Amino acid sequence: MTRWNRGMTMGMSDDDAKVHDALKKLERDLKNIKSSKVLLVGDIMMDCYIHGFANNLNSRAPVPVLKETSRDVDVGAAAHVARGLDSLGLNSHLHGIVGDDDSGLSILEMLEEEGVQTSGIAVLEDRTTTVKTRLLGAREGLVKGEQLLLRWDIEDDTPIPDSAITSLIERTVESIPNSSCLILSDYGLGVLNDQGAERLIQVAKQHNVPVIADPKLTGLHRSQGVDWVLFQSKGLELMRRRLGATTGAEAAAMLLETNDWKHLLILEGQDG
């Protein structure tokens, strides 16, 4: 895990000072939390994992045949984040949109069973809930782990009605003053549009509520001025290339300046 911010500390190397400043700021933010209520706004989806053995190729095409052995269904995207926050003892209030289909209702049921607050989730008629299915296979009898064979997405490409977005944003705005933190979880599916994200950030600033953003790389403008931004290391490397930066640290500094972020937290995936 790597952290960058704009602060500097006398007597330390540049890298040590950056980490020191970020940790101290995070410590202050945690100490200043007024309540355990965390507002989370973003895209909600379902993740499905189909496991099996891929021992043979199809006779009519050079593709593996997966013999299913098990499958797992779980909440994904912002819903997964909400569950994680609750597991840390925080009281997450998730605001998002699902369709009035089996997948959408299943997401609500799973979250409610785990005690996640779902009153901020709108169920839209005639809308399909996003489902991402991954087919994972391995050769039977081999020690080597599974490999991803295919990802199959079910998505509704029709824009979410403006009235639904406006209602969602305004309900969230009403809850900001009594919250300890606002998290924007943007997967580019339409829940966080430009105007909605800007309004949420402005209101949070007015009430001194810190904002954390997990942005889509193609929607960084929707996180302008937030306190903390989360990036995967692969995402930072991609942005380094786009920006023509020499190092990840240089790219991080450019992103902080361009987007008026206070801190950038780089996650190293399975390496922490």
Language-model-derived ranges and their functions:
Residues 13-20, 38, 46-183:
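Conserved N-terminal subdomain of the carbohydrate kinase-like
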Residues 23-38, 171-174, 203, 215-222:
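Short amphipathic alpha-helices and their capping/turn segments at secondary-structure boundaries
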Residues 41, 183-184, 212, 230:
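Generic enzyme active-site microenvironment
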